[in-house]
Amino acid sequence: NIAIIEACEVTPDGKIYLTAAGGIAPTVCRLADQIIVELNAAHSKNAMGLHDVYEPLDPPYRREIPIYKPSDRIGQPYIQVDPKKIVGVVETNWPDEARSFAEADPLTDKIGQNVADFLAADMKRGIIPSTFLPLQSGVGNIANAVLGALGRDKTIPAFEMYTEVIQNSVIGLIRDGRVKFGSACSLTVTNDCLQGIYDDMDFFRDKLVLRPSEISNSPEVVRRLGVISINTAIEADLYGNVNSTHIGGTKMMNGIGGSGDFTRNAYISIFTCPSVAKEGKISAIV
């Protein structure tokens, strides 16, 4: 029962400061008998303070998760463990294996504009408040196009994000002042972008927070905040059934966080995709 935890810093009294993701690290550290800390120099110590580590109590003593806006911090910036559980610290310098996505094209730009127009219309109708609502977005070139369109639409005010992952496009919108705050479980950004965040942490410190996945993806919090979820579909039918994870029933293309945790609990749930795939040979509407 050994946990291996990546960190940017560890202290003699058992404080572990995580790097670019929260995941299930707090739970793993609590349950493990022994902990090996991977002290990764590829992640700057400037990451200290980026995380908000919180674990709910077990029933019957569990209370609500007291997050009432995306920027709320309810825990600690580190994982506290018994120092006796830490049996080793291994020093590494290994960057994340981040990948970039294809640039936007006329098709993805049009999808993005359609979403922006839809949300702007809902805001005019009073379905969405004039201050807007927090967004959750998946990752990929379509998601980038949607976020780009929302950022360019000046009828939509600067907004917050309560999401599972934050990608490069969100960081750009934060720098431009179009995203006021981003709450997520992980930073899924390119290494250059991540280094830029670390180098400019004085700017980002009050604009980003990383949480454990059971908090970032909590149905309770998603419902309370009135999150608008935007995820990519592989195929959908006219009855509203959406496949956003598998191709051919066996090849997994996407995780289930967006579809499983956010879509089912969001105030407004949106799926985006082109109408056809494989150069028009396969319909995405089945």
Question: Where are the regions a protein language model picked out?
Answer:
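Conserved alpha/beta enzyme-core scaffold
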Residues: 1-286
